[in-house]
Structure formats: structure tokens, C-alpha cells
Amino acid sequence: INNNTTGVCDQYEDYTNLFTDVTEGQSYNIDISLGDCSNNYPSGGKVFIDWNIDGDFNDPGEEVGTIPIGLPSTTTIPFTVPFSGAYGATRVRIVSQFLNNTLVGSIGPCDIGVMANPIYIQPWYGATEDYSIVINSATVSANYLWSNFATTDSISNLSIVTYTVDITDQNGC
């Protein structure tokens, strides 16, 4: 996903229409170019992924990385897709904050900043953005049924006739 956002502290943005596919057990990187809310204020943030697709970011391992406090820069956050058995579309949340003497550790997945110029309204101001990833299984489990009643994924030593195969995946499709 490559998305150059507005660069302003606009609270929450829903970019879940932007997605990429990932496969369990594989490693990936998220490269985040964190801007600021003006005047080169130091910012930091966190990245969360809803691995079990339960609609929140509160489960162990769903906080996948920290964007260290600093002036605008790019941070690479590596992650490995866990073998969770949850497949399909889920959310990636990036929370960035102007850290007015606040530690990055205090940033939570449900934080949505508030900004009013020229006064900062607590708890902070920044941006929260949601994206999507589609989690795919590392292996595709399937059942095979050939017209000669074989049940393996391939057959050999065949007569010259037409063969058909019905393949059913782990979802019964």
C-alpha cells in the first residue's frame, strides 16, 4: 500500500479500501513516513494489526511496532504474520501523535487526536489511519475426488480417457 495522506493532523481517516495480501508465516515491512502537524514538532506513533479479525487491537501481539519520537522521518516496522487460523480482510491501524512531553508507550489503538489552532486540546493531536490487509493461509487444504475415485492431488498410470476432478477447499467451496 502506498498512500501519501494529507499531512495534516486530521484525527481519523478510513483507508480500508486500500489493501494488500499477506500470507501467514511470512515476514513483511511497513515503511511509514511520519510527517508532523506543522513547525517540525516531534512526533511518534504505533502500528496495530487485528490478527484474529475480532474488530479490536487489544489482543496479545496486535501492537506490531513503535514509531520512535523524532522529527519527520521514515521508520521501517518489520512483522511476521502469525499462524492464527483467521483468514480474510482485517485492519491495520497507524496512530501518530505530536508528543508534547508524552511517551510513545502511552499511545493506544483507539486514540483519535484533536487539534485546534493555535491551542492544543488534550489529550493530544495527530492522526489515526486504518488500512486493510487480507490474511491468506500458508497452505491450501483441499480434498480431491477424481472421476476414477482417486483422492490424491495427482494421479498417474492412466488410460487415455477424459478425467474430471472435484476440488473442495477448507471452506467447503
Task: Map each language-model feature to its residues.
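Surface-exposed, flexible coil segments in extracellular/virion-facing regions
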Residues: 60, 140-158
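Extracellular/surface recognition and adhesion modules
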Residues: 49, 94, 133, 146, ...
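Solvent-exposed segments in extracellular or luminal domains encompassing
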Residues: 68-82, 153-170
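Histidine/glycine-enriched, metal-chelating micro-motifs
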Residues: 54, 172-173
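Append "Rare intracellular matches occur via the same short Y/T/C beta-strand/loop motifs
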Residues: 29-32, 142-144, 161-171
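A broad "non-catalytic interaction surface" signal
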Residues: 1-137
